[in-house]
C-alpha cells in the first residue's frame, strides 16, 4: 500500500501531489507536460529536489536527497523510453534482474506472455520501440519488486501485445500483492489496472492532484470524459452509453472472444473516435463501422443518433468510424465501469 505527500519545484515547473489514504493500484493521469513522469520519478527517488514523504507498506521513504536511494527501494520501473543495456541481448537484459527472492513469474512465462522468443538473441540497440518496451516490462516483473512504477508502458505496443502485457501486469500485481503506480493518458488502461486515480491539473502555474478512489474520480466534475460500453451477448451488440444516449454496434469478434466467462465491458476515450471518409481503410486491428455523419459531432448508425463529446472534424457525409482503445475489463473492475456510465 502506498501513501505520499510530495512537492517539487524545478525552474518554472512546480508540482504538488498527494495520496492521503493507502492505495495499492494508482493511476496518474493528466495532459502532456502536467508532471506525470516527474511525479513517478519523485516516487522512485530520482528527483533530488523533491520534498515530502513516501510511505510504502510499513516503510517511510523520505523524498529528495535524504531519501532512500532508488536501488534500495525494491522497485521495478519502466520508463516512457525504455532503458536497456544497449550491447546486451534481449535475453541478457531480462536475466540481468537477479532478485533476492523468486520472481512472481518464471523467465519462460514472461517470454511466452510477451512474445519475446524471436527477439531474445538480438542486442537491445537492434530492437524496435515496441520490442524494447516489452523487454523492459519483462525485466521489471522478473526483478521481483515490491512495487511497479510504469510510465506509459504500453504506448508502443500493437493491440494484441498491449492486451497481453496488460493482463500479465494485472495478474502479477494481484498474485503478489504488489503496489502499482501507472502514468498514462489512456483512460482504459487506468480503469483496467488501477483502483485509485490522481488527475493532475495545472492551476495558477502549479500542477496539483490528489488521489481518489477510481469510481469517485470518474464521477467527479474533473473526470475525463468517457464513453463506456457493455457487450450484450444475447443480442450480439456492443452498447456504448454517454449522456443518456446509446450507440449499438455489432460486437467485434475480438471483444466476444476475450471474456468467455460472462459479459464483457469496454471503455473508449472520445479522443480515440475517428471519422474516416467512406472507403478509407481502418487502422490495423480496429473494428470499423459504417455510419452517417450529421453535423460536426453527430453520428447516425442504424436507428441511433449519437452526439459525441468531441467534434469529428472535416469529412464526408457517409463515414466509417473506428473505436480505438476499446478494452475488456476484468470482471472485478466492472463495478467501476457501472459507476462511470453517464
Q: Which residues are covered by each model-predicted region?
A:
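A short, proline-enriched helix->beta-strand linker immediately N-terminal to the Walker B motif
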Residues: 142-146
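Internal alpha/beta loop-helix hairpins
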Residues: 170, 174, 184-245
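Catalytic Walker B motif of ABC-type/P-loop ATPase nucleotide-binding domains
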Residues: 148-152
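Conserved ABC ATPase signature
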Residues: 123-127, 131-133
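Glycine/charge-rich catalytic "coupling/switch" loops of P-loop NTPases
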Residues: 244-288, 311-342
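Conserved ABC ATPase "signature" region
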Residues: 59-63, 104-119, 170-171
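ABC ATPase NBD coupling module
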Residues: 60-77
Amino acid at each position: 500500500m502506498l501513501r505520499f505527500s510530495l512537492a517539487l519545484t524545478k525552474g518554472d515547473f512546480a508540482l504538488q501531489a498527494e495520496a492521503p489514504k493507502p492505495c495499492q493500484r494508482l493511476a496518474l493521469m493528466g495532459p502532456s507536460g502536467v508532471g506525470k513522469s516527474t511525479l513517478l520519478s519523485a516516487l522512485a527517488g530520482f528527483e533530488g529536489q523533491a520534498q515530502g514523504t513516501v510511505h510504502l507498506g510499513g516503510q517511510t521513504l523520505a523524498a529528495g536527497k535524504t531519501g532512500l536511494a532508488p536501488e534500495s527501494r525494491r522497485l521495478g520501473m519502466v520508463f516512457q523510453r525504455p532503458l536497456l543495456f544497449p550491447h546486451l541481448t534481449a535475453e541478457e537484459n531480462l536475466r540481468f534482474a537477479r532478485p533476492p527472492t523468486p520472481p512472481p513469474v518464471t523467465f519462460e512465462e514472461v517470454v511466452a506472455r510477451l512474445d519475446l522468443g524471436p527477439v531474445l538473441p538480438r542486442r537491445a540497440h537492434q530492437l524496435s520501440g515496441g520490442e524494447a518496451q516489452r523487454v523492459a516490462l519483462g525485466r521489471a516483473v522478473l526483478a521481483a519488486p515490491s512495487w511497479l512504477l510504469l510510465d506509459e508502458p504500453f504506448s508502443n505496443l500493437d493491440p494484441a501485445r498491449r492486451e497481453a502485457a496488460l493482463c500479465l501486469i494485472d495478474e502479477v500485481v494481484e498474485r503478489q500483492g504488489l503496489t502499482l503506480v501507472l502514468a498514462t493518458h489512456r483512460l482504459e488502461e487506468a480503469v483496467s489496472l488501477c483502483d485509485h486515480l490522481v488527475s493532475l491539473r495545472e492551476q495558477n502555474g502549479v500542477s496539483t492532484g490528489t488521489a481518489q478512489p477510481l469510481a469517485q474520480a470518474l464521477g467527479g466534475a474533473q473526470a475525463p470524459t468517457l464513453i463506456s460500453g457493455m457487450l450484450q451477448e444475447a443480442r450480439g451488440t456492443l452498447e456504448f452509453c454517454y449522456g443518456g444516449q446509446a450507440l449499438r454496434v455489432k460486437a467485434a469478434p475480438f471483444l466476444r472472444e476475450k471474456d468467455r466467462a460472462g459479459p464483457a465491458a469496454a471503455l473508449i476515450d472520445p479522443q480515440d473516435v475517428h471519422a474516416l471518409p467512406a472507403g478509407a481503410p481502418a487502422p490495423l486491428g480496429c473494428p470499423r463501422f459504417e455510419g452517417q455523419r450529421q453535423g460536426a459531432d453527430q453520428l447516425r448508425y442504424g436507428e441511433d443518433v449519437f452526439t459525441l463529446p468531441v467534434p469529428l472534424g472535416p469529412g464526408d457525409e457517409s463515414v466509417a468510424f473506428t473505436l480505438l482503445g476499446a478494452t475488456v475489463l476484468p470482471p472485478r473492475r466492472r463495478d467501476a465501469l457501472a459507476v462511470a456510465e453517464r
